């Protein structure tokens, strides 16, 4: 099936597609900020240049478009009828690259969360954002529960009296 647009029109259409500060990304950023999460945006030093980086949580968030990243079983992912072999190969390369970047981030000790464009549509938005908040809180608790507090030592004296850590005496029999 031939393309209905001229090459100049197609170029203009493709050029207008943004990769940063997209509407789904801005929704997530606004929600996180309103809930007290502080983050960095598009950190180039990390593999894949994540959309949102929460350093305190060692977590990165990618907000993927269903078409560009090939979201399987999604109504928003439909291969174009024109130039299908090109698009199929491109989407497959994007998926492979995404997988490699997630592996690299995992090896560096980062948690990765992926949100899909379809999860941020009005019907699922609230549930998705609350799930994201819950996941971040869970990651925070897991990271900080690794450092278990040691109990205070109880010092025993030879007379059978123990001195508690707060200075109070306890007599034992």
Language-model features: locations:
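Nucleic-acid endo/exonuclease domains
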Residues: 1-114, 118-173
């Amino acid at each position: 099936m031939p393309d209905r647009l001229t090459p100049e029109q197609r170029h203009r259409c493709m050029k207008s597609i943004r990769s940063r500060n997209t509407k789904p990304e801005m929704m997530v950023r606004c929600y996180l900020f309103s809930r007290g999460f502080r983050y960095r945006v598009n950190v180039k030093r990390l593999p894949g240049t994540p959309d949102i980086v929460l350093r305190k949580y060692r977590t990165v968030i990618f907000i993927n478009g269903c078409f560009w990243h090939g979201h399987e079983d999604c109504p928003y992912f439909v291969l174009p009828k024109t130039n299908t072999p090109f698009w199929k190969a491109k989407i497959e390369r994007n998926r492979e690259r995404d997988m490699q970047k997630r592996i690299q981030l995992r090896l560096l000790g980062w948690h990765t969360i992926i949100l899909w464009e379809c999860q941020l549509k009005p019907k699922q938005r609230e549930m998705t954002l609350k799930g994201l908040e819950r996941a971040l809180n869970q990651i925070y608790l897991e990271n900080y529960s690794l450092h278990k507090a040691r109990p205070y030592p109880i010092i025993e004296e030879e007379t059978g009296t123990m001195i508690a850590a707060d200075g109070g005496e306890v007599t034992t029999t």
